[in-house]
Amino acid sequence: MYAMLVLLMSIPGIGLFYGGLTRSKNVLSTMEQCLAVFCMAIILWVIIGYSFAFGPVEGVLGDFFGGFGTMFLAGIDFNSLSGTLAEYTWVIFQGAFCAISACLIVGATVERVKFSAILIAVGIWIVLSYAPLAHQVWGGGFIDSVFKSYDFAGGTVVHVNAAVCGLTGAFILGRRHDLGRVAMAPHNLGITYIGACLLWIGWLGFN
């Protein structure tokens, strides 16, 4: 149930929230980017993300990522447990966190990046940044074992991680070409309101 609430934040929640804030000519593209990034994040999570974040630790590098032992969810069945939870439940719940984190980045580059570019960039970020950091903070890796970290509601893995990626992308892309010359009023604040309500409901599961 909590996983479904987190998924609700990604689609349609954050798609509606961002879509309403963009200009009318970009609303569909923005929502499509959120949906595509969400779907890609879930696929990458199953293929390699979960293994990097929570898979069996392998050697010295185990402090930084979990390894390749559970790629494609290998070795996990309906009897597998993660703590007291069925491991498939844990996979879905953590996959929802990965997906919402990826969707957050879209807002930093909206109206300024090609569809293919955002997919490639976020895909690389999931594999090389999100999953390893999730392992280090939540999966018993370096940060958790050395600093005894407390990550409240994804403050580090989700929010700081996605914010740094989004800010970096915004700096690389630079200002919008029409900034200051063309009105950039939000397309539909009613849609944004609905998205914000869905995000608020989803936060009950997120937290």
Identify the residue ranges that each predicted region occupies.
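Hydrophobic alpha-helical transmembrane bundles of multi-pass membrane proteins
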Residues: 1-206
